[in-house]
């Protein structure tokens, strides 16, 4: 199974445009499943093997969201194997996805955002880069994989726009705020000497040695500034995206526009943020109204 799994992960990355984060997690899921089925051959697998694996995960107290992801991974893997004529049918196709716990996305308030955006304050190349990354995450609501994948020619300084390659290689154009543009210019001026002049596609955000920043590098960088500011809460690059959507809706943006900015395929994915803003209104009402 291992060779088939490697081919599948390569297919995801090259043909489906899956992020580094997704391919890494799917690799973990497939290794776990391979260990569970032991020496059983792929063509001999049935839906009962998949159900047994899911039951095993439940006994190990995996969350419903983790089990759902592992099932989604297996569905995609077996679909790929059917396409490659390794299997005649997908044994995971008819298995229902466990209902996820409805968890509202966490976000930062404007004061917390301001503290984080001001955290990279040194006049160094690295902190200029870090500030522009934080500004971009909040200004345009990008996924970390989308930000890491940006190239020079994706950014339109004069128009204040950026071309983003989202999930499934779908492109969208997103505005970039003035504060983010100013930070990008400051970083840009110090960036040129470190670039790889021979690179055809020049990455927008680079490491000390001139290579493209990875998703993991951006996550580590965000954590560094969270610790520096002492905010005392769990914050990741995706928290900036949640904050972007919540603040946009708080200030009157319509749901469809926010959906387009975030690159959500379904409006229902964006609607979770309306629950966040409604909950905040209820809390404000309960704490301030004399007869609440």
Residue ranges of model-derived segments:
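Conserved catalytic core of the tyrosine transesterase superfamily
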Residues: 1-292
């Amino acid at each position: 199974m291992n060779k088939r799994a490697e081919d599948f992960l390569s297919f995801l990355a090259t043909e489906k445009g899956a992020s580094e984060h997704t391919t890494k997690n799917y690799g973990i899921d497939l290794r776990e499943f391979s260990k569970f089925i032991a020496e059983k051959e792929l063509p001999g697998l049935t839906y009962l093997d998949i159900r047994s694996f899911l039951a095993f995960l439940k006994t190990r107290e995996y969350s419903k969201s983790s089990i759902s992801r592992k099932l989604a991974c297996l569905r995609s893997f077996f679909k790929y194997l059917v396409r490659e004529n390794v299997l005649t049918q997908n044994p995971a196709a008819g298995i229902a996805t466990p209902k996820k716990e409805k968890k509202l996305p966490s976000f930062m308030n404007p004061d917390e955002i301001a503290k984080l955006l001001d955290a990279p304050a040194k006049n160094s190349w690295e902190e200029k880069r870090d500030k522009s990354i934080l500004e971009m995450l909040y200004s345009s609501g990008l996924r970390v994989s989308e930000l890491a994948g940006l190239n020079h020619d994706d950014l339109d300084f004069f128009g204040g726009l950026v071309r983003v390659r989202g999930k499934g290689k779908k492109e969208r154009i997103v505005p970039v705020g003035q504060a983010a543009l100013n930070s990008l210019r400051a970083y840009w001026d110090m960036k040129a000497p470190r670039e790889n002049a021979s690179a055809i596609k020049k990455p927008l955000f680079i490491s000390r040695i001139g290579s493209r920043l990875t998703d993991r590098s951006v996550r580590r960088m965000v954590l560094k500034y969270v610790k520096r500011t002492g905010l005392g809460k769990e914050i990741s690059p995706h928290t900036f995206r949640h904050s972007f959507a919540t603040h946009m809706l708080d200030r009157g943006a319509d749901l469809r526009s926010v959906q387009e900015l975030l690159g959500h395929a379904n409006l229902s994915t964006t609607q979770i943020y309306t629950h966040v803003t409604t909950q905040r209104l209820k809390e404000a009402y309960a704490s301030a109204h004399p007869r609440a």
